[in-house]
């Protein structure tokens, strides 16, 4: 290694630092998805079954979302009903 190479500003990042950065992005993404409760998919499935007793709908016609605002949690339920 040359003495001038040591002081160069345009060094390429090492593969280890690139791998570390990518892993941090993946971990942050996984943590973001864990914020939804485990019961949400089963709740959506059961809601579809109950609504199907009265109205003909598909699995994609019911959307369930849970939002947290401070100490309050809001369960949002959107149902697309067919035209009569």
Swiss-Prot record:
This is Cell division topological specificity factor. Prevents the cell division inhibition by proteins MinC and MinD at internal division sites while permitting inhibition at polar sites. This ensures cell division at the proper site by restricting the formation of a division septum at the midpoint of the long axis of the cell. InterPro entries: MinE, MinE_sf. Pfam families: MinE. GO terms for biological process: cell division; regulation of division septum assembly. The gene is minE. It comes from the Bacteria. Belongs to the MinE family. Keywords: Cell cycle, Cell division. The keyword Cell wall biogenesis/degradation does not apply. The keyword Cell cycle applies.
């Amino acid at each position: 290694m040359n003495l001038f190479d040591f002081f160069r500003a345009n060094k390429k990042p090492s593969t280890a630092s690139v791998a570390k950065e990518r892993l941090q992005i993946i971990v942050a993404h996984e943590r973001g998805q864990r914020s939804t409760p485990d019961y949400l998919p089963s709740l959506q499935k059961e809601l579809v079954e109950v609504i199907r007793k009265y109205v003909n709908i598909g699995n994609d016609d019911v959307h369930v979302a849970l939002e947290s605002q401070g100490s309050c949690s809001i369960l949002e339920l959107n149902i697309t009903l067919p035209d009569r």
